[in-house]
Amino acid sequence: MLSSILKKIQPSLLVNFRIITRTYATKEVTVRDAINSALDEELARDEKVFIMGEEVAQYNGAYKITKGLFDKYGGDRIIDTPITEAGFAGIGVGAAMAGTRPIIEFMTFNFAMQAIDHIINSSAKTHYMSGGKVFNPIVWRGPNGPPTAVGAQHSQCFAAWYGSVPGLKVVAPWSAADHRGLLKSAIRDDNPVVYLESELLYNYKFDLSDQEQDKEYLVPIGKAKVEREGKDVTIVGFSRIVSNCMEAAEILAKEGISAEVINLRTIRPIDAETIVNSLKKTNKLVTVEEGWAQSGIGAEISALMMEHAFDYLDAPIERICGADVPMPYASNLENAAMVQTQNIVNAAKRVTQRNK
């Protein structure tokens, strides 16, 4: 149609005129491959970036996140360490102070407890204690939260632990695009970022748009995303639990309840504005997390909404959390301790008074 209009206006314009169209191809990618591609692209982009951790090099990582990177970049940039989290965490902090950009991989964040002194006392506080003169551009990454059948000592969610610390940014991505964009933003940040993954998400597949596949695609730290719009209730979650929130929204829709789902993406700083704007529409809120209720992310969001959105609330806020026990090993007890989709559905029905 554009060609015919131009023909009428000025035939001579058509001599070298072509209508250029661009197709936006989506690509299905696992979360594992999304993280791997982000690491690869940032290693190629900046020679100051390197990866250090247990089995990250020749073994390609315990979960194969670093597959192929040792062969491509060599042992000077993909560095295997002994099983001494406190040791290589301290080396990472010092290297970051010296101007490099370390990515420290923990086989699980449960093992990062051995290194928590360096993460909090060295890494998080350096910029403040130096009066803004010394930066600490380091990424602390690895699986967080409960996987399956690994017992109490390997199943904790550390979002609230690190989310309470000034000087840290804390992210917990869900989709493949989240993982790519937030990891790139974390690596390029001039101060420490705790990057919480989920072992149970590694094999999940998501579509990546043309834009999300771009090497310069970034997800801003501190910005939540509305994954599904709704008008009756707001459901807020992060990391793997967003999948359960989306499933719950589908079930609720069949029962006439329109749920808005917010993917928090960043734990610190929390994007309170996006939640407040959602509450202006729905007037009801359910928070969901895999961690414990006391002093958790849901508790913090509830406090923020009391301060910034009290007048918009038509019902008490519901918090759905993991059971207040160390994670059991027996599968039936483990299922009882973990958040299930039906827990979210029931909470949404309670706040909308549709549970009768």
Swiss-Prot record:
K(+) binds at I138, A186, I187, D189, N191. It is an enzyme of class 1 (oxidoreductase). Transmembrane segments: none annotated. It catalyses: N(6)-[(R)-lipoyl]-L-lysyl-[protein] + pyruvate + H(+) = N(6)-[(R)-S(8)-acetyldihydrolipoyl]-L-lysyl-[protein] + CO2. The keyword Aminoacyl-tRNA synthetase does not apply. It is found in: Mitochondrion matrix. GO terms for cellular component: mitochondrial matrix; pyruvate dehydrogenase complex. One of its GO terms (molecular function) is pyruvate dehydrogenase (acetyl-transferring) activity. Its cofactor is thiamine diphosphate. GO terms for biological process: pyruvate decarboxylation to acetyl-CoA. Residues 1-25 form a transit peptide. It comes from the Eukaryota. SUPFAM superfamilies: Thiamin diphosphate-binding fold (THDP-binding), TK C-terminal domain-like. Keywords: Metal-binding, Mitochondrion, Oxidoreductase, Potassium, Pyruvate, Thiamine pyrophosphate, Transit peptide. Thiamine diphosphate binds at E85. Its EC number is 1.2.4.1. Tetramer of 2 alpha and 2 beta subunits. The pyruvate dehydrogenase complex catalyzes the overall conversion of pyruvate to acetyl-CoA and CO(2). It contains multiple copies of three enzymatic components: pyruvate dehydrogenase (E1), dihydrolipoamide acetyltransferase (E2) and lipoamide dehydrogenase (E3). This is Pyruvate dehydrogenase E1 component subunit beta, mitochondrial. The gene is pdhB.
